[in-house]
Amino acid sequence: MFLDKSRVKPEIILRKNDLITPAVTSLENICKMARISEDMESTTVGGFVFILRPYSSNSIFSIYLLEALCSPTLVEHIKSITNKSGQAFYNIGKERLATVLIPLPPIAEQQKINTIIEELFQKL
């Protein structure tokens, strides 16, 4: 679907380092996320997708945040705070998502963690 830019809120245009995740999904798809690697000036998301926009535009932080949010511990925690919405869907409210605590080591440590995880994925 194409809309004139004047009809699109600037805050929903995808930017480099944004993370996107479904707001309403099946339980097994909770925390399925993607990181936006470059500005996408003509791309937005729909109403059932969250944009998680890190306060820092640093790629190291964005990659670390994605890895942390997809870790088994945080996935299980986020699953535990979702609401069932209908027969088969779960809803992650912004208010509940905002309560998730994520450990944030210094940026140099985040880089080391990112590198180790990337090396492990290359071995798969």
Label every PLM stretch briefly.
Residues N58-I63, Q111:
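Short, conserved charged micro-motifs
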Residues S71, V75-E76, R96-L124:
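Amphipathic alpha-helical coiled-coil/heptad-repeat segments
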Residues L3-S6, N58, E67:
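Alpha-helix N-cap/helix-initiation motif
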Residues P54:
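Extended, Lys/Arg-rich, non-catalytic nucleic-acid recognition/anchoring regions
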Residues S42-F50, K84-P105:
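A short glycine-rich beta-alpha junction/loop motif
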Residues M1-L19:
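Sequence-specific dsDNA recognition surfaces
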Residues M1, L19-G46, I63, E67, ...:
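Short, ligand-facing micro-motifs at secondary-structure edges
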